[in-house]
């Protein structure tokens, strides 16, 4: 397995290095994307594919009276997210679970906000995953997707060749999948190669 495969599912020592790098490397696009998220101070938030936990920490700050949960199928990512958010976990405001977005343990209509930063590239069955996100999101809730790559760059093909199981979607493709899952009010924001999409249930 190449080092870059750790972007999909971090494992072992290389995975630990990768999640630390992602926390730093993805910070600019994450901060940009979060400006399009109107979350209440007491919101219940889920971060799908939470990686190294940096975005969970940002969401906890954005929702100071809320609860933020994270889910990731990589044990390395779960461990790192728990370390990064140790204080909030001790306060009962945060939890990190290992699992798949395609089959989540959460109850229907549970979260006010769900986020997915730099992760939908790797979801194996995107329509199914979007339906599952829709299921656990409250009516009126917001789903935010934030990607560094929007499918319009020649470099995108290079990344999909290096990283197995990676698909870089264009905004129009994601919009169709979201609407098929039941979402509406799909809004698309772009900055250079960056893409942020918000959708309502």
What function would you assign to each model-found segment?
Residues 24-43, 58:
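Conserved alpha-helix/loop element of class I SAM-dependent methyltransferases that forms part
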Residues 44-103:
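Class I SAM-dependent methyltransferase SAM/SAH-binding core
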Residues 37-39, 62-63, 88, 137:
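A generic alpha-to-beta junction signature in SAM-dependent methyltransferases
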Residues 10-23, 142-198:
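C-terminal alpha-helical "lid/dimerization" subdomain adjacent to the S-adenosyl-L-methionine
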Residues 102-113:
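A short acidic, Gly/Pro-enriched loop at the edge of an enzyme's catalytic core
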Residues 113-125:
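A short SAM/SAH-binding and catalytic strip from SAM-dependent methyltransferases
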